[in-house]
From Swiss-Prot:
<keyword id="KW-0708">Seed storage protein</keyword>
<comment type="function">
    <text>Seed storage protein. Not integrated in the gluten polymer through disulfide bonds, unless incorporated by reduction and reoxidation during dough making. Increases dough strength and bread volume, but decreases dough stability when added into a base wheat flour.</text>
</comment>
<keyword id="KW-0732">Signal</keyword>
<dbReference type="InterPro" id="IPR001954">
    <property type="entry name" value="Glia_glutenin"/>
</dbReference>
<dbReference type="Pfam" id="PF13016">
    <property type="entry name" value="Gliadin"/>
</dbReference>
<keyword id="KW-0758">Storage protein</keyword>
<comment type="similarity">
    <text>Belongs to the prolamin family.</text>
</comment>
<dbReference type="InterPro" id="IPR036312">
    <property type="entry name" value="Bifun_inhib/LTP/seed_sf"/>
</dbReference>
<dbReference type="GO" id="GO:0045735">
    <property type="term" value="F:nutrient reservoir activity"/>
</dbReference>
<dbReference type="InterPro" id="IPR016140">
    <property type="entry name" value="Bifunc_inhib/LTP/seed_store"/>
</dbReference>
<keyword id="KW-1015">Disulfide bond</keyword>
<feature type="signal peptide">
    <location>
        <begin position="1"/>
        <end position="19"/>
    </location>
</feature>
<protein>
    <recommendedName>
        <fullName>Avenin-like a4</fullName>
    </recommendedName>
</protein>
Amino acid sequence: MKTMFILALIALAATSVVAQLDTTCSQGYGQCQQQPQQQVNTCSALLQQCSPTPYVQSQMWQASGCQLMRQQCCQPLAQISEQARCQAVCSVAQVIMRQQQGQSFGQPQQQVQSFSQPQHQVPIEITRMVLQTLPSMCNVNIPQYCTTTPCRTITQTPYNIPMSATCVGGTC
């Protein structure tokens, strides 16, 4: 039961981080600006309708609705570097830890700040659960050092990492 709860929190946290950090480039200038996306609703539905557990996953993810929601939640993670994925895993673990402590998500601006500057040390069991679930759920590789390096070390250097970028008239 505790594992199901943590898996549900992983899916919710991953989708929240992706939704908050989704970016679009302004036309003609090539500068990325953060814009809130409606992926939060899609990912919430994914969490409620499509189980992230490996046993049920093979049957549930075959439904076209689940496939679409999975694509909208996981595609941005596949588009960033492996180093950025490692940091994203830590960010997801931090969000889960805050949820377990009863803290609210706050405003998107606050989440972006916590992405680059963690305020709490993430328990290793939460990080391990994210490392075991997120890569397989989204079919992405996570660098080996993510499994051995504490999140506080990985995220000490702030990175400006857009989880997804669509550029019109310029480059990001």
